[in-house]
Amino acid sequence: MERNQRRTLVGRVVSDKMDKTITVIVETKRNHPVYGKRINYSKKYKAHDEKNIAKEGDIVRIMETRPLSATKHFRLVEVLEEAVII
């Protein structure tokens, strides 16, 4: 698979406590098959962050890659928006 054909997702970092690993929550909306109501779905992915640049609350883009560990199949592409620290 070429790099530009791999699946990319945009989500929010919910954990950066691991070394070179972040946990990203990706939220999507879908219609209920019977009732038609919009329902929010969310899924967590672990992603490889080589330089530890992403912090908790950041909006990031991750890309599918070869398995890096038992649970890590994505890598950080870029930080789209940094979290505001209050």
From Swiss-Prot:
One of its GO terms (molecular function) is structural constituent of ribosome. Belongs to the universal ribosomal protein uS17 family. CDD domains: Ribosomal_uS17. The keyword Transit peptide does not apply. It comes from Streptococcus uberis (strain ATCC BAA-854 / 0140J). NCBIfam families: PRK05610.1, uS17_bact. This is Small ribosomal subunit protein uS17. InterPro entries: NA-bd_OB-fold, Ribosomal_uS17, Ribosomal_uS17_bact/chlr, Ribosomal_uS17_CS. Gene3D superfamilies: Nucleic acid-binding proteins (2.40.50.140). GO terms for biological process: translation. Keywords: Ribonucleoprotein, Ribosomal protein, RNA-binding, rRNA-binding. GO terms for cellular component: cytosolic small ribosomal subunit. One of the primary rRNA binding proteins, it binds specifically to the 5'-end of 16S ribosomal RNA. The gene is rpsQ. The keyword Ribonucleoprotein applies. Part of the 30S ribosomal subunit. PANTHER family: 40S RIBOSOMAL PROTEIN S11 FAMILY MEMBER (PTHR10744), SMALL RIBOSOMAL SUBUNIT PROTEIN US17M (PTHR10744:SF1).
